[in-house]
Design a protein with these regions (language model features):
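Acidic, metal-coordinating helix/loop segments flanking the phosphotransfer/catalytic sites
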Residues: 39-57
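Receiver (REC) domain active-site loop signature in two-component systems and cognate sites
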Residues: 64
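Two-component/phosphorelay signaling modules centered on CheY-like receiver
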Residues: 19-38
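C-terminal output helix
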Residues: 113-126
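Non-catalytic signal-transmission and effector/linker regions of two-component phosphorelay proteins
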Residues: 1-13, 26
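Active-site residues of response regulator receiver
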Residues: 16, 61
Length: 131
């Protein structure tokens, strides 16, 4: 069993192209008790960030200009730094669920979010990831 403090100290990367979304997600995680949170609005930087920091969880928006979440996951898989992609994808398009899971995401959250669901999915994934 993983201690709760280990889960709240897990490293989390938030990826979204909109500053308001990044700030909201970061605030929710901070308010919940998470302490090691990194954010980026540059999806092209995710692979390099993950290879340097080995995040325990990546909270990834799917719909972003220039490079979408599917492309980010493809780059992460191709880099091979972590065979287990610790990705939860976020999107307003529930029809992308299967495609996202097939691309390597471990979980999927549809917009609009229920905050309790988001917190629970993040906690549960980190609990499994840190075993």
């Amino acid at each position: 069993m993983i201690a709760e403090f280990a889960i709240f100290n897990a490293s989390v990367l938030i990826v979204d192209d909109r500053a308001a979304n990044v700030q909201l997600r970061e605030q929710v995680l901070h308010d919940t008790g998470y302490t090691d949170i990194t954010t980026t609005m540059a999806p092209a930087s995710v692979c390099a960030l993950h290879s340097t920091h080995a995040y325990d969880l990546i909270l990834l928006d799917l719909k972003m200009p220039v490079m979408d979440g599917f492309e980010v996951m493809a780059q992460l898989k191709a880099a091979g730094t972590d065979p287990y992609l610790p990705v939860i994808v976020l999107t307003a398009e529930p029809r992308h669920k299967l495609q996202a899971l097939q691309a390597g995401a471990k979980d999927f959250i549809s917009k609009p979010f229920d905050l309790l669901e988001v917190k629970t999915r993040i906690y549960n994934m980190l609990e499994v990831r840190l075993l």
